[in-house]
Structure formats: C-alpha cells, structure tokens
C-alpha cells in the first residue's frame, strides 16, 4: 500500500508541471510575452518547457528522483519570487504559497526518495 501511495503522490505533485508545460506549448508567444513582462528573457521558455516535461516524468518513473526533486523545488521557489510577488492580490498570494508548498513537497521527496516502485530502486550497485 505504501508503494502505491508513494507512486500516486509522485503523479499528483508532477501533474501540475506537465499541465503547465502543455499550456505553455499551446500559447507559446503569449507565455513568452508574459514572461518578458517580468524581466525574464523569452528564450528561457523553451528550456522551461523542457524542464517541466522531463523532470516530472523522472519523478513519476522514479528515475533520479532526488535530483529532479531538488531542481523542481528550486524552480518552484524561483517562480514564486519572480512571478507571484504582488501581495496586494489575493490570487497572487495563493499562487506564491502554492509554489512554496510544492517546493516543500519536492524537498520532502528529495530527502526521503521514492519507495520501491521506482527505477532508482531497481538499480543494482556493485562496490569494488
């Protein structure tokens, strides 16, 4: 049961990023303009989409889970600080703390790692 819940949790925490990447692809130029409005160069969008697809898939599959989790935790914190700093707007406050909460979840995953249903757990290391 623990393995199933761990796997479901990895899907849940990753799904937001997969959906976000999908939306960025559908509205590429609009997202690029929006990012540039916050001082983020538009050329970063391609790398952002790549990260929002690859790293969540790594987490779901349990491959390099700790590293992917640390990167997404840092990404979530950076996103909160850059894009959700208008604390006069209730929606922006919620979005800020959503990203901070996601970072906390990713750090928890980085500390504890995935359970048995993960590629990382299937690896066999040989000490020489």
Predicted regions and their residues:
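Extended, low-polarity transmembrane helix blocks
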Residues: 1-26, 33, 42-50, 54, ...
């Amino acid at each position: 049961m623990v393995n199933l819940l761990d796997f479901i949790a990895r899907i849940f925490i990753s799904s937001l990023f997969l959906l976000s990447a999908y939306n960025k692809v559908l509205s590429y130029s609009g997202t690029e303009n929006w990012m540039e409005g916050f001082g983020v160069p538009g050329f970063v969008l391609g790398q952002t989409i790549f990260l929002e697809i690859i790293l969540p898939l790594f987490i779901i599959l349990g491959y390099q889970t700790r590293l992917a989790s640390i990167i997404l935790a840092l990404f979530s914190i950076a996103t909160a600080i850059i894009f959700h700093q208008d604390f006069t707007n209730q929606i922006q406050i919620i979005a800020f703390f959503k990203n901070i909460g996601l970072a906390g979840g990713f750090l928890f995953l980085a500390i504890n790692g995935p359970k048995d249903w993960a590629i990382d757990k299937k690896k066999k290391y040989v000490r020489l």
